[in-house]
Amino acid sequence: MRILSVGWFRKTSNTSFHRHEALKKHSTYIDKVEAGPTSLSLAYRIAFRSFQMGLPVKLPDQMDVNKKIRTLITQNGYDIVWIDKGLTVDASTLLFIKKKLPNAKIVSFSPDNMALRHNQSQNYLESIPFYDYTFTTKSFILNDLMNLGAKNVNFIHKTYSENFHYPRKISNKEKERLAADVGFVGVWEKERCDSIIYLIKNGVKVKVFGDGKWNEYQDKYDNLTILPGLFSEDYPKALQTFKISLCFLRKMNYDQQTARTMEIPACGGFMVAERTEEHLELFKEGKEALFFSSNEELLEICKYYLSNEEERKNISNAGLKRCQASGYSNEKTVEKMLNIVLGLK
């Protein structure tokens, strides 16, 4: 199978990179087009802001993604053109692919809620009808995507990478730097910040790896440590070394599950996540992960399991086994998606 893969591949912790690596395992030949700029230009920022204000302004193609796609399509034949999110991919480029390679399948994948404007672009909205298959990790937006013109819309759960998210041998120096009673890795949002402050005000020590607005809380509370975000192998190591690893959902995306949902248990971490129907389907509550619906319940869980190491270990081990047994990996999930595209499932 010959694949052209388009996405953001610069960081080894990027899920787009992990999907590309999974695609490589299922291809006989693969090319890639890097769509992620090292920094966003002023023109890009202005265009994005204008689009968010409701104007039909397209994002500038800083990385010449469309030109590179057209060049490769002209030079090589592909069975599948896989586009991760594709905010700067133009409809005219997809039509070019269809003209040059009428038998190729064009696939759209995004881990974000693409029914919401803050995740979209004008380029994306104009391109939606020309994708042959659309995959989303949001079970509740299938009809929304179809109303935008998407065809063959499929829901796929979040995933972890077998080559990146796994239990590691961790040195004592790494433990000193990364370990925490309760830890969280991620961006600031009000609800999750409120939950963390509730914990620290009730005697629980929390370590946060995050940038931006988190820096405003540096040295503000005795029980709170703020450190820079993690984007290397320190990320899975941290999830493994936290006694309790918090998994919050993005309220602005109405998430039912998130990347951390799979990554924490896959790394051998003890996950405490927000309670949702999808979380309860993915992991057995109290056996493979813990869930909470209020700050009071979160505090109760943290205090109990910080004092019960053996139970934490048993649940962490069970969560890891569930990830493996249920096929939550990128490799298994990408294989499932490719089978759908090829009509094998």
Map each language-model feature to its residues.
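A short, well-ordered alpha-helix in the C-terminal region of glycosyltransferases
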Residues: 311-326
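Nucleotide-sugar donor-binding catalytic core of glycosyltransferases
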Residues: 1-45, 51-53, 61-71, 75-76, ...
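N-terminal Rossmann-like NAD(P) cofactor-binding module of classical short-chain dehydrogenase/reductase
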Residues: 82
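Conserved acidic donor-binding segment of nucleotide-sugar-dependent glycosyltransferases
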Residues: 258, 289-295, 304-309
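Surface-exposed amphipathic alpha-helices with a cationic face
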Residues: 94-101, 200
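A short, histidine- and acid-enriched strand-loop-helix "catalytic/donor-clamping" loop
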Residues: 104-119
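C-terminal alpha-helical cap of glycosyltransferases
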Residues: 330-345
